[in-house]
Amino acid sequence: MPESSFDVVSKADRQEVDNALNQTAKKIAQRFDFKDTGAQIRWSGDLGVEIRANSADRTLAVLDVFKEMLIKRGVSLKFLDVGEPKPSGKEFRLAVTIKQGIPTETARRLITLIKDEGPRGVHAQIQGDQLRVSSKKKDDLQAVIALLKAKDLDIALQFTNYR
């Protein structure tokens, strides 16, 4: 009997994040409490978001609006790595990084979790920034998916390539 497998990945949907960013920019342009604060949000590189405003609490308020839009778009907040508001001239900047991939240390913890608490005969291996889980029984793979969904991890997981 051939082995079945699936991949465990941690990738934010870039298009949904972009939509949330555009909605946030539109909302802060319309809201009265952001008037004359110089508040703006934009992409900074491929996976970075930069928030600017004339005070630290206005940058955090824009961040709250951005988080609200991400939740509405179905993107987990576990993808965000938020820095501290830093003064830069007459304004404050806040750097937000979108985390992609499963770090090696977290992947090792997931493997030990699967070996300790998962069904017997399930094998997990690290492949770059993702995890491949394989077994001869599809029911065991579904049990592993349920196990990983039940655990409160510090990263958001998706299950892809189910064969």
UniProtKB/Swiss-Prot annotation:
Keyword Nucleotide-binding appears in the UniProt entry: yes
The keyword Calcium is annotated on this UniProt entry: no
InterPro entries tied to this protein: DUF520 (IPR007551), UPF0234-like_C (IPR035571), UPF0234_N (IPR035570), YajQ-like_sf (IPR036183)
A single MF term (Gene Ontology): nucleotide binding
Keywords: Nucleotide-binding
Coiled coil spans: none
Database matches in Pfam families: DUF520
GO cellular component, one term: cytosol
Family per record: Belongs to the YajQ family.
Its job: Nucleotide-binding protein.
Annotated protein name in UniProt: Nucleotide-binding protein Acel_0286
Lineage: Bacteria, Bacillati, Actinomycetota, Actinomycetes, Acidothermales
